[in-house]
Amino acid sequence: MVQRWLYSTNAKDIAVLYFMLAIFSGMAGTAMSLIIRLELAAPGSQYLHGNSQLFNVLVVGHAVLMIFCAPFRLIYHCIEVLIDKHISVYSINENFTVSFWFWLLVVTYMVFRYVNHMAYPVGANSTGTMACHKSAGVKQPAQGKNCPMARLTNSCKECLGFSLTPSHLGIVIHAYVLEEEVHELTKNESLALSKSWHLEGCTSSNGKLRNTGLSERGNPGDNGVFMVPKFNLNKVRYFSTLSKLNARKEDSLAYLTKINTTDFSELNKLMENNHNKTETINTRILKLMSDIRMLLIAYNKIKSKKGNMSKGSNNITLDGINISYLNKLSKDINTNMFKFSPVRRVEIPKTSGGFRPLSVGNPREKIVQESMRMMLEIIYNNSFSYYSHGFRPNLSCLTAIIQCKNYMQYCNWFIKVDLNKCFDTIPHNMLINVLNERIKDKGFMDLLYKLLRAGYVDKNNNYHNTTLGIPQGSVVSPILCNIFLDKLDKYLENKFENEFNTGNMSNRGRNPIYNSLSSKIYRCKLLSEKLKLIRLRDHYQRNMGSDKSFKRAYFVRYADDIIIGVMGSHNDCKNILNDINNFLKENLGMSINMDKSVIKHSKEGVSFLGYDVKVTPWEKRPYRMIKKGDNFIRVRHHTSLVVNAPIRSIVMKLNKHGYCSHGILGKPRGVGRLIHEEMKTILMHYLAVGRGIMNYYRLATNFTTLRGRITYILFYSCCLTLARKFKLNTVKKVILKFGKVLVDPHSKVSFSIDDFKIRHKMNMTDSNYTPDEILDRYKYMLPRSLSLFSGICQICGSKHDLEVHHVRTLNNAANKIKDDYLLGRMIKMNRKQITICKTCHFKVHQGKYNGPGL
């Protein structure tokens, strides 16, 4: 049988064998095509795990099978059947084996002659390469538009009207096309281009001109080749995106003068398109966020934050940044050459036990993240739910507590929803799908995908991939979490308003026990019996707590903390919790931690954002007597929601940090780590601790009790610390020396109880701001950002090569001012950044600078 099929000279046998080979080639090529489509279905490596060589083999193998093997064998089969004769290149009697190897040699020669497939390094932001044409071509500069990636699998897009692969757009540096096709292109586009321009660079490079990276998903390669197919010539760009390759380096001051600080027309258009609109499709986001002005504003926002002087995985901070770096950063983002480095993963203890992973990113990359965050905030903030308060402008934990007080005072059940590892379990593909609903900018989405897949480095310096979740601690993570969980907010709004809430407040059912006791009181003749019945009735509400004809539910969310107030039954609460869990699993790929999520009666209360939230029991509510006819009746007041500060927990935290002892008793004690500081520093430290606690809990119902307890602990702890510092032994001697308010004789700083008086009034400003408000804010911030780079060196007066010197903190100690001249000058100016030239900056870090004499 084998000899018949492999060595037969019968035309019919060979035709059948060719037909079988054509079918097999078509099936194998289709399978390869499906694998390629799945791999390119989304940004980043999908199923091949970054194996670029395997991807190249699949692309070339698919091309060979679908272009050569399948159609050639099928055509040969038809010829054999029609003429019933074996046709061979060498002889009519030549067998199949010779013919097979002949065609294989032809295919192999064409692959090596016309196809060049290269393997690139695989990393966190790399997806491998593709087969690229290597023919001699001409250089055509590219700028301003997106080019489709040239693949052997999508050459039918323009001629057939559909593509065999997803449309992936990217940014390239140079496109290479055949000379005759360039003539056709320039003729169609009415561009007058000289012959010398077409042939530029072809002679020196033998026609094999290369760019610096692939356009595919914005991942840079190593000297990759990009070939534009003839069908897609009308989409080639005309100007170079990297003008710095052929341009001399500009002086920083000359560049700064070209920055327009007043024209924000594109940004204004983006704001107006998204102001109170939830279905706007946004494009060109990457170009806007990579604008040097937006990067300057982003830098101005993050430059003074303490965490931005913490080193990431590459030990680079904001120190030494200059306008040239921001200019290069802008170009790298715009050309998709920018990559996020892995974050440094640290673990911090949680109050409930265990550890929370925290990501420490590269401070300079936070400039890019802040610019991304500003774009996302402009697009999404006005469409967020009214009940969402986390990480939004003009909103905070306190506004969330106020909303609880306004809406949940009549609820009889509270549901505390605990999302299971919220930040760490957000699926990347679902997050990308949510963003794609309103953002149609592949460059921006690729940049975001690079951030999500950048990975992290643990404490042992081992690299780990990230395929799930968003890094806690990054600048853009909070708003990404809000965007993702906004689906949950909209679901709860729709469920409560359209499905759960029923009935009218005026038609609420009366409590039968209350009505029965009221009737007995009315019929009772003895005063003593009547008083007993009245006291018994006080334990019951007039209206039914769980009335099937009247139900209400409200929720408030701050990031991943959710509280739901329910006017209904306990079974209603269970159903709501199960419905939320099912929605999260089916639509967001998340779940609820059922062990930590609780359903409690409103009298018991739950903990939300550090407050103990509960409702005053009916029998403890105050009442007043009103006259009704000839009789007086007693009417209960409607009290507001009780939001107490957990005083015991706060005292335990002070105990943990050394301000008191004896657990919840809170016996004050001195803090040994402060005795070597100045008296002014000690007083300001205690005042800062007290103000921080009072400021956060200023809405607490038990604020007066809290203030008295905390003031007592901090005041006497401060006295004991000063007693140890000045060796006065007792608190009495400290008060006799410094007075009842502990006045520092030099700075006149005192420990006054009046400093802990916090206003209870809260400014409930609407989070939905207008485009004019944002523009005014940016127009104010941009000149301040430019002033850091457009001044003079504060040491030598130079105007060139200016950099920004950063310090972590400003220490007011006199010895620092004396020992370090530059730091002392920054302390006097009250600035954590100062502009100096590159030469002076080098001397500062080498320890060779100690005054203006240098």
From Swiss-Prot:
<dbReference type="InterPro" id="IPR003615">
    <property type="entry name" value="HNH_nuc"/>
</dbReference>
<dbReference type="Pfam" id="PF21368">
    <property type="entry name" value="AI2M-like_HNH"/>
</dbReference>
<dbReference type="InterPro" id="IPR000477">
    <property type="entry name" value="RT_dom"/>
</dbReference>
<dbReference type="GO" id="GO:0005739">
    <property type="term" value="C:mitochondrion"/>
</dbReference>
<dbReference type="GO" id="GO:0009060">
    <property type="term" value="P:aerobic respiration"/>
</dbReference>
<dbReference type="GO" id="GO:0003964">
    <property type="term" value="F:RNA-directed DNA polymerase activity"/>
</dbReference>
<dbReference type="GO" id="GO:0006397">
    <property type="term" value="P:mRNA processing"/>
</dbReference>
<dbReference type="GO" id="GO:0006314">
    <property type="term" value="P:intron homing"/>
</dbReference>
<dbReference type="InterPro" id="IPR036927">
    <property type="entry name" value="Cyt_c_oxase-like_su1_sf"/>
</dbReference>
<dbReference type="InterPro" id="IPR049030">
    <property type="entry name" value="AI2M-like_HNH"/>
</dbReference>
<protein>
    <recommendedName>
        <fullName>Putative COX1/OXI3 intron 2 protein</fullName>
    </recommendedName>
</protein>
<dbReference type="InterPro" id="IPR043502">
    <property type="entry name" value="DNA/RNA_pol_sf"/>
</dbReference>
<dbReference type="GO" id="GO:0004129">
    <property type="term" value="F:cytochrome-c oxidase activity"/>
</dbReference>
<dbReference type="InterPro" id="IPR024937">
    <property type="entry name" value="Domain_X"/>
</dbReference>
<dbReference type="InterPro" id="IPR023616">
    <property type="entry name" value="Cyt_c_oxase-like_su1_dom"/>
</dbReference>
<dbReference type="GO" id="GO:0016020">
    <property type="term" value="C:membrane"/>
</dbReference>
<dbReference type="InterPro" id="IPR000883">
    <property type="entry name" value="Cyt_C_Oxase_1"/>
</dbReference>
<dbReference type="Pfam" id="PF00078">
    <property type="entry name" value="RVT_1"/>
</dbReference>
<dbReference type="GO" id="GO:0006315">
    <property type="term" value="P:homing of group II introns"/>
</dbReference>
<dbReference type="Pfam" id="PF01348">
    <property type="entry name" value="Intron_maturas2"/>
</dbReference>
<feature type="domain" description="Reverse transcriptase">
    <location>
        <begin position="329"/>
        <end position="613"/>
    </location>
</feature>
<dbReference type="GO" id="GO:0020037">
    <property type="term" value="F:heme binding"/>
</dbReference>
<keyword id="KW-0496">Mitochondrion</keyword>
